[in-house]
């Protein structure tokens, strides 16, 4: 089965997880992937004898939900999640969505009557006014990057962990120079600031040096972004993130608070290459088959993440009990030509049979040319 669906990503603080689970159960959504993450912010700590406070990083546990929904109900479902979790309160999390092309062996069973009643259907969607910047680096480097972006005040970074495969397998003894454990950091920023953020990240993480990491960006709809970059005592009737959210609503966008200037943008802009995201979710043996198939057809690197597959459909719960299974996500960033080769090879295999629950999603991403030009690989190793 091939179709276009929307993927809603919701990063939820651990304290609002129960409210989010109840909301997803009310909507009877059949396919949700969940994994652990953390949100990083700044906190000012008082020193002994009232000396000048010290600023340090504060980590808050969170869960990252990837929710598959029909595109027509995307806006209504996001709004219902926001209201159910009171997500607009600073520090609770963020939510965004994008449209993907999905390939799956078994069809989805959405309760469209319930979605129509609770969320409503619309063909009009908000603009893709934000960018998701995803940075894959060696474990231990993420704190410095998070601190740098927090100082700019554009968003609260989201961090989760994975492992790199592909490139290391081809290096022989040299593979010891590239750690297998990876940190994946997400920054959800206004599109007007995306280029400036990338300019900060690339030299700090040495992403223009082969083997140091990988970065890509994709445009998303983000009705709520976590702007509580600094924690501390509340000194006024409204917090700074509440003031910013109100001004965004009044002005109709976040462009008024862009960090960079529009002047001379053409001469200073980063050159990017249009690439494709190829994300496969399945059981461990299915992921290994897909990875080998992709590598055999030109993909040079991938990142693996452990996920939990959930169904919030009451019928599934009654038939199979609590539907919750361990899964793996294998994500590859590659050229459109390599993507076509991978899809042709999949079509000739039995990976997506009638009983298979694995899924493959593809979508457009942009990669800075300085990374691809300097790296010996075209993908995220």
Which role does the model predict for each range below?
Residues 1-381:
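Positively charged, small/polar-rich N-terminal and surface patches that mediate targeting and assembly
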């Amino acid at each position: 089965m091939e179709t276009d669906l929307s993927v809603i990503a919701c990063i939820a603080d651990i304290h609002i997880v129960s409210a989010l689970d109840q909301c997803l159960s009310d909507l009877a959504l059949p396919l949700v992937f969940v994994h652990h993450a953390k949100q990083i912010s700044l906190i000012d700590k008082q020193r002994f004898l009232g000396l000048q406070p010290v600023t340090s990083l504060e980590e808050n546990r969170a869960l990252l939900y990837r929710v598959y929904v029909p595109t027509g109900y995307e806006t209504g479902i996001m709004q219902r999640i926001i209201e159910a979790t009171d997500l607009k309160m600073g520090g609770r999390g963020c939510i965004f969505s994008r449209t993907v092309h999905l390939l799956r062996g078994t069809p989805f069973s959405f309760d469209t009557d319930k979605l129509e009643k609770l969320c409503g259907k619309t063909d009009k969607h908000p603009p893709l006014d934000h960018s998701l910047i995803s940075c894959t680096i060696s474990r231990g480097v993420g704190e410095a990057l998070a601190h740098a972006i927090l100082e700019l005040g554009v968003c609260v970074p989201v961090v989760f962990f994975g492992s790199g495969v592909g490139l290391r397998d081809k290096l022989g003894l040299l593979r010891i120079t590239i750690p297998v454990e990876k940190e994946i950091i997400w920054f959800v920023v206004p599109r007007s600031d995306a280029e400036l953020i990338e300019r900060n990240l690339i030299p700090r993480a040495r992403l223009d040096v082969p083997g140091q990491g990988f970065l890509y960006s994709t445009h998303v709809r983000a009705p709520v972004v976590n702007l509580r970059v600094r924690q501390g005592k509340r000194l006024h009737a409204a917090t700074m993130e509440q003031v910013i959210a109100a001004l965004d609503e009044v002005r109709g966008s976040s462009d008024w608070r862009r960090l960079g200037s529009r002047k001379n943008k053409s001469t200073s802009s980063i050159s990017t290459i249009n690439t494709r995201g190829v994300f496969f979710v399945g059981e461990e043996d299915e992921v290994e088959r897909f990875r080998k198939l992709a590598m055999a057809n030109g993909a040079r690197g991938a990142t693996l993440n452990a996920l939990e597959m959930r169904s919030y459909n009451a019928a599934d719960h009654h038939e199979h009990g609590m539907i919750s299974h361990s899964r793996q996500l294998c994500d590859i960033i590659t050229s459109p030509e390599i993507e076509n080769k991978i899809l042709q090879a999949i079509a000739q295999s039995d990976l997506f049979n009638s009983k298979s629950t694995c899924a493959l999603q593809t979508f457009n991403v942009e990669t800075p040319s300085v990374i691809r030009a300097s790296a010996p690989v075209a993908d995220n190793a």
